[in-house]
């Protein structure tokens, strides 16, 4: 059975935890393992933080959009902003690369997403924003809820 959720919120750093918990609560109905749920929560945190810090450069008037689609044991996440986009996507996806060293950012966001998810697609256009499509196939072990 397919189920879908859409969420939008202001690009404020305090909304990162709201996004993470909301997505986790929605995904819980698939009964993921604790490890799977933790990985998805981490990926949501990374993507939302990137949108707020890099996409909107701290402009709270921006909006972050999240879509979650559940199908059987598959989770599809789309996290989108309408910020400044990514100038050099290949460079941005390199471990430890950051455009904000003064904020003590580690530059591991995309690396974490790629390691925790089964599929990662990043589409970015300068001045039009960034969309990240993430897919995770769950083990379907009935670990948390049953």
From Swiss-Prot:
Pfam families: HATPase_c_2. One of its GO terms (molecular function) is protein serine/threonine kinase activity. Signal peptide: none annotated. Its EC number is 2.7.11.1. Keywords: ATP-binding, Kinase, Nucleotide-binding, Serine/threonine-protein kinase, Sporulation, Transferase. It is an enzyme of class 2 (transferase). SMART domains: HATPase_c. Belongs to the anti-sigma-factor family. NCBIfam families: spIIAB. This is Anti-sigma F factor.
């Amino acid at each position: 059975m397919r189920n879908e959720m859409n969420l939008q919120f202001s690009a404020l750093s305090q909304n990162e935890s709201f996004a993470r918990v909301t997505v986790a609560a929605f995904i819980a109905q698939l009964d993921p393992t604790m490890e799977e749920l933790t990985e998805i929560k981490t990926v949501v945190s990374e993507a939302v933080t990137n949108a707020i810090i890099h996409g909107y450069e701290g402009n709270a008037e921006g909006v972050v959009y999240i879509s979650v689609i559940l199908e059987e044991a598959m989770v599809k996440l789309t996290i989108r902003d309408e910020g400044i986009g990514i100038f050099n996507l290949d460079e941005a996806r390199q471990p430890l690369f950051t455009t904000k060293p003064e904020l003590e950012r580690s530059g591991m966001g995309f690396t974490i997403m790629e390691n925790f998810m089964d599929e990662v697609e990043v589409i970015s256009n300068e001045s039009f924003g960034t969309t990240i499509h993430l897919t995770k196939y769950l083990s379907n072990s009935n670990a948390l809820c049953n």
